[in-house]
């Protein structure tokens, strides 16, 4: 469309018919032209400027389509060209100036019409071409006034256009607050508090930086900084650093009173050390009451272990303390311990003896250690938790010492040696029998018999777990068994 318009503008001699058509439509109030130097120059100047401005403003203010605007621009350009060619205006310098400026005015009119059809600023700025046309025609004889008006229009319209563009950009920035078009160095982050106003700048007065709070985010060095801490860290106090980097922003307004007492190093000493003392004091009355006599060993010198401390009273303790100690449950389930527990303080004599009897009817075995009584009860029940891990053996025993004795049969170790003849034995009871042969008059036969019998007895004891046998590391009876008691068990 613009190319067609330019072709029409560049035609050297338009047809007179177009002049008649255009003159009939545009020149209703014009009088017949006369060939005068000054008047024709001035009138040509007026006609050229009025035609160009009329064509553009009419196309823009009527709000027509782009084709109508282009047609109007083409008609105005043709009329201006015909006027300049038909009325040559003599040889005056104004005629050459008009003939040059008329074509430039037509081109400017066409460009302005094309811009007005698509620009949102057409209604306000329909005279974009006026400064160029008037300035060019100012070179003529009567174009001085046009030149002055061009300067005034140039000084008025161009700042208005720039301000219009800036206001539209500001409106876009209001819609999209993070697009810094008008102000590229303005911060994107706006204060969220409604009463801040323009206080949301990064360098707001009175607000310290977030890294200047202190060594720790709770640590406050002095009361002045503690008093300034809520104001400098509250989100409404100012700016970018409070909305992004403040870890205490939402809490200092509520807990500002704690900055002097709980968060200060001097005042927080009463929270740590006395609290620790109070907590430790809470355990002090419990420990002596629960374990009043835990320091001395009650069976030291009696040949017992710690397990027998249950039924026996402490040497330095009162009957009341011992009753409180054993009030929870009986340490042993044997009949003697149950009777001592039932009697309470009166059963202190039974506890002092430390006797643990088997509750199986008809057995009557008594042991000085609860571990020995438990091993004996396993012998009654048939429980054998100790298993030999020797290859292809897998024998099971009721006591751990029996298992160790059995392992020596696999290894062939003889730990016990006779001090007289240096003979070695696997079991201590065999050695004791052998020593008796040296002290008595039994001779070697008895020793050999005891040795062979000891060997056989070792196997049978390991197999049957006889509780009355007196080997080393095995539970010993308080009363030695009768000579035929072992054989009866076997």
UniProtKB/Swiss-Prot annotation:
Sequence segments annotated as region (Disordered): 1-47, 136-156, 294-324, 431-490
One BP term from GO: dorsal/ventral pattern formation
Bias (Low complexity): 16-25, 36-47, 297-314
Extent of the signal sequence: none
Zinc finger (C2H2-type): 314-338, 344-368, 374-396
Segments carrying motif 9aaTAD: 208-216
CC terms in the record's Gene Ontology section: chromatin; nucleus
Primary location class: nucleus
Compartment(s): Nucleus
Keywords from the UniProt entry: DNA-binding, Metal-binding, Nucleus, Repeat, Transcription, Transcription regulation, Zinc, Zinc-finger
Gene Ontology molecular function: DNA-binding transcription factor activity, RNA polymerase II-specific; RNA polymerase II cis-regulatory region sequence-specific DNA binding; sequence-specific double-stranded DNA binding; zinc ion binding
Bias (Gly residues): 136-148, 439-455
A Pfam family this chain is assigned to: zf-C2H2
SUPFAM superfamilies for the chain: beta-beta-alpha zinc fingers (SSF57667)
Family matches, as Gene3D superfamilies: Classic Zinc Finger
Family: Belongs to the Sp1 C2H2-type zinc-finger protein family.
Role noted for this protein: Transcription factor which plays a key role in limb development. Positively regulates FGF8 expression in the apical ectodermal ridge (AER) and contributes to limb outgrowth in embryos.
Domain notes for this protein: The 9aaTAD motif is a transactivation domain present in a large number of yeast and animal transcription factors.
PANTHER family reported for this sequence: KRUEPPEL-LIKE TRANSCRIPTION FACTOR (PTHR23235), TRANSCRIPTION FACTOR SP8 (PTHR23235:SF25)
Name this protein carries in UniProt: Transcription factor Sp8
Source organism per UniProt: Homo sapiens
Organism placement in taxonomy: Eukaryota, Metazoa, Chordata, Craniata, Vertebrata
